[in-house]
Curated annotation (Swiss-Prot):
PROSITE patterns, alphabetized: GST_CTER, GST_NTER
Limits of the GST C-terminal domain: 97-220
Gene Ontology terms: cellular component: cytoplasm
Organism lineage string: Eukaryota, Viridiplantae, Streptophyta, Embryophyta, Tracheophyta
Disulfide links within the chain: none
Presence of the UniProt keyword Acetylation in the record: no
Highest taxon of source: Eukaryota
One Pfam family, short name: GST_N_3
Matches recorded under SUPFAM superfamilies: GST C-terminal domain-like (SSF47616), Thioredoxin-like (SSF52833)
Source organism: Oryza sativa subsp. indica
Gene Ontology BP annotations: glutathione metabolic process
Family (UniProt): Belongs to the GST superfamily. Tau family.
Domain GST N-terminal: 5-84
Protein name: Probable glutathione S-transferase GSTU1
EC number: 2.5.1.18
Length: 231
């Protein structure tokens, strides 16, 4: 029974949203049980746990479900305050901390609204619409690089380590190769500092353990193309 475990994650191997949760729990040193979902035949547990959206990831904490990856990340900060924070701790009356939290949330939302959406269109489209999506993706990556600046990590929790934005964005680095192949550009050329950040993150144990290889992701994209008749 999932309710007997402290933390259980209902997930799918290639989902960047589920990977966020896995990386966050690894960064916090939290042990959890991973349960792979068949998205073509979703489990009763998943459907009961997320009846509104009926999708992964879902975190079960002592049997209580928490849905939506960015919500889960913030929940982990709140539920396990003794672990490293992804967001700057909320201190009453601390305007700087409040601003840092708001900024981190903005950029995590940007990743979901812009990068994920554009990435999905890249493999679904053909011809000039696909090329236009490739140009859009290049601009999105440049925008993220500008926000990163000369910092080692985006931060959000402080301390020169992975923060909220890093954990939100880093799973998509496993998709960079697919974006390049579909969009006709090079991440290294359009956003070299962001590419360096991706390599730096990839050397961190919590990231390396939970991200699939770019080649495996590209193979999965090929399966999706065939499934939806794109090829």
């Amino acid at each position: 029974m999932a309710e007997e475990k402290e933390l259980v994650l209902l997930d799918f191997w290639v989902s960047p949203f589920g990977q966020r949760c896995r990386i966050a729990m690894a960064e916090k040193g939290l042990e959890f049980e991973y349960r792979e979902e068949d998205l073509g035949n979703k489990s009763d547990l998943l459907l009961r746990s997320n009846p509104v959206h009926r999708k992964i990831p879902v975190l079960l904490h002592a049997g209580r479900p928490v849905s939506e990856s960015l919500v889960i990340l913030q929940y982990l900060d709140d539920a396990f305050p003794g672990t490293p924070h992804l967001l700057s701790p909320a201190n009453s009356g601390d305007a700087d901390a409040a601003y840092a939290r708001a900024t981190a949330r903005f950029w995590a939302d940007y990743v979901d609204r812009k990068l994920y959406d554009c990435g999905s269109r890249l493999w679904r489209l053909k011809g000039e619409p696909q090329a236009a999506a490739g140009r859009e993706m290049a601009e999105i990556l440049r925008t993220l690089e500008a926000e990163l600046g000369d910092r080692e990590f985006f931060g959000g929790g402080g301390g020169g380590r992975l923060g909220f934005v890093d954990v939100a964005l880093v799973p998509f680095t496993a998709w960079f190769y697919s974006y390049e192949r579909c969009g006709g550009f090079s991440v290294e050329e359009v956003a070299p500092r962001l590419a360096a950040w991706a390599r730096r993150c990839g050397r961190i144990d919590s990231v390396a353990k939970h991200l699939p290889s770019p080649e495996k992701v590209y193979d999965f994209v090929g399966v999706l193309k065939k499934k939806y008749g794109v090829e």
